[in-house]
Curated annotation (Swiss-Prot):
Entry keyword annotation includes Chaperone: no
GO biological process: methylglyoxal catabolic process to D-lactate via S-lactoyl-glutathione
Functional summary from the UniProt entry: Thiolesterase that catalyzes the hydrolysis of S-D-lactoyl-glutathione to form glutathione and D-lactic acid.
Record family assignment: Belongs to the metallo-beta-lactamase superfamily. Glyoxalase II family.
Complex and partners: Monomer.
Pathway terms, separated by semicolons: Secondary metabolite metabolism; methylglyoxal degradation; (R)-lactate from methylglyoxal: step 2/2
EC number(s) from the headed UniProt entry: 3.1.2.6
Metal-binding found in the keyword field: yes
Alphabetized SMART domains for the sequence: Lactamase_B (SM00849)
Cofactor note (record): Binds 2 Zn(2+) ions per subunit.
Protein name: Hydroxyacylglutathione hydrolase
Catalytic EC class: hydrolase
Reactions catalysed according to its record: an S-(2-hydroxyacyl)glutathione + H2O = a 2-hydroxy carboxylate + glutathione + H(+)
Length: 263
């Protein structure tokens, strides 16, 4: 499996992705908003885009569909309930469905509601797994629930699915928010050594050259994966004095998301 991360450089700070089979040159485009860069990258690599996948229905992820499909004839894949939200879906997928790219690439669909209720992530069937997480899991952060989402569903996705993936899973999110997210981590957990160590290298960085994190890394500096941290809970109580002495993880997650909305 070959992964090509495409930095759009737009105001939304989107990443687009191409996943290619090294044997056949067939490729899957994930959320190809910047259709020009996506098509140009495939052309330079000698790949044929045969499928397009949208992680969810928001325009900054679907806006390049028409141009890519017109140029390549690719089939469009999305959540099985997204047909009324995304035009021209050819294949609706559910949890456990597998997307094959060429002869060698298999990507398992995870039904990951929260950011929206029609959100999917992809997990690769590779020796070192990779997670294409859309707007669910970001580097050092979590998606918002402003436009069709639900914070309890997002918590469940984190707790019941993402946190249980292997620690060596590579994380490929839909946006570059790592600098701001690390600053949020340090505001919530000032003694977080991993966040302190990483922040200088991503301050005013070039996202096109940004390092790829693993889930193990995320568990060290992503506040939304550190819900039992005494430091996180103590600082959270300063903002929410009525927080129980031993708050449950769901409550901590929801309160953190509330604070992140204002960050």
């Amino acid at each position: 499996m070959i992964v090509e991360r495409i930095w759009t450089g737009n105001a939304y700070r989107n990443f687009n992705y191409l996943i290619a089979c090294p044997e056949t040159g067939e490729a899957l485009a994930i959320d190809p908003l910047d259709h020009e860069k996506t098509l140009a990258t495939a052309r330079v690599k000698g790949w044929q885009i045969t499928q397009v996948l949208n992680t969810h229905e928001h325009h900054d992820h679907t806006g390049g569909n028409a141009a890519v499909i017109a140029a390549t004839g690719a089939k469009l894949i999305a959540h099985h309930k997204a047909g009324g939200r995304i035009a021209g879906v050819d294949r609706g997928v559910k949890a456990g469905d597998v997307i094959k790219v060429g002869k060698t690439v298999e990507l398992e669909c995870l039904d990951t509601p929260g950011h929206t209720m029609c959100h999917i992530c992809l997990r690769s069937h590779t020796e070192q797994p990779a997670l294409f997480s859309g707007d669910t899991l970001f580097n050092a952060g979590a998606g918002n629930v402003h436009n069709g989402g639900d914070v309890n569903a997002l918590y469940a996705t984190f707790a019941e699915q993402l946190a249980r993936l292997p620690d060596d899973t590579l994380v490929y999110p839909g946006h570059d928010y790592i600098e701001n997210n690390l600053r949020f981590t340090l505001a919530r957990e000032p003694d977080n050594a991993a966040a302190k160590a990483l922040l200088p290298s991503v301050t005013d960085h070039d996202p096109a050259k940004s390092a790829v994190t693993t889930l193990k890394d995320e568990k060290e500096f992503n506040t939304f994966l550190r819900l039992s941290s005494p430091s996180v809970i103590a600082r959270l109580r300063e903002s929410f004095p009525d927080l129980p002495d031993e708050p449950d993880a769901r409550t901590v997650f929801a309160k953190l998301r509330e604070l992140r909305n204002q960050w």
